[in-house]
Amino acid sequence: MTNPESTAIDPVAAMGTDHTEAPAHPLHKVLSFVRRSGRLDDRLQRAWDNYAGTYLLDIAAGNLLDVREGVTLDRAFVESAWGNDNPLIVEIGTGQGENVVAAAAAHPETNFLALEVYDPGVAHTLLLAGKQGLTNIRVAQVNAPELFKVTAAGTVAEVWTFFPDPWPKKKHHKRRIVQKAMAGDIHRALVTDGVWRIATDIEDYALHVHEVMDGLDGWKNLGSVTVSLPLEHVGKGNADMAADMPHADFTESERFEGRVLTNFEKKGLAAGRVIHDFTYQAVTLN
């Protein structure tokens, strides 16, 4: 596969200025993904070769997809990478890119950053964006928590996390992308009253989101829909047990109208799963 570092955009070099170095990363990090073979078929390889130089940001370092030392995602970075100071929306885990590319096409006045770790997903996003000739979208193949650690305050208008890896085993819940530490970094990155939109079709993950986010200082749940969820986690393969557990009411959101119906979401609906939407607004910390 073509080395992305040889073709990708390097906004840090383009700015020609010194930026605060990224903090040192621990040797052993909890990752929200597992690296798999990234072999591309001919069509996706051509997409990578043709469009990486236009859309792919050269900010990754190392096989764990850490953010390269010296990179800071701030307004100067945005202006260098996108060529304007329009609001920035970041989608974490864009998969095949269907949603983020559709959003970018529908909102040319907004900048979009697609975060995806898997080569085929990155390549397919490049393909969709390139076929439409979009100019307001960029792609970064990095670990999202690491990028938000080096994102300056007030840089991002919205963060989207739609259908993240559910990590169903209880021992793996620490790998779920929605965590208090991540919420803290996203809160800092967002503009005043910016929002974090989350969606999942896994009931156990919905409970996890409520446990992490509801009542967390600095966040306001903007939902208006009452849902009933079990009060305990059931673990992988035990979803049927949830119906007999004690339940409580929680507040969630209507389906986000800005999210297209992707193939992934269609499969969840076809399997009879309920979609849980969340909208959390960043407010002043107490």
Swiss-Prot record:
The keyword Phosphoprotein does not apply. Substrate binds at residues 169, 201, 262-265. Residues 1-21 are annotated as: Disordered. The active site is at 165. It catalyses: guanosine(46) in tRNA + S-adenosyl-L-methionine = N(7)-methylguanosine(46) in tRNA + S-adenosyl-L-homocysteine. PROSITE patterns: SAM_MT_TRMB (PS51625). The gene is trmB. This is tRNA (guanine-N(7)-)-methyltransferase. Keywords: Methyltransferase, S-adenosyl-L-methionine, Transferase, tRNA processing.
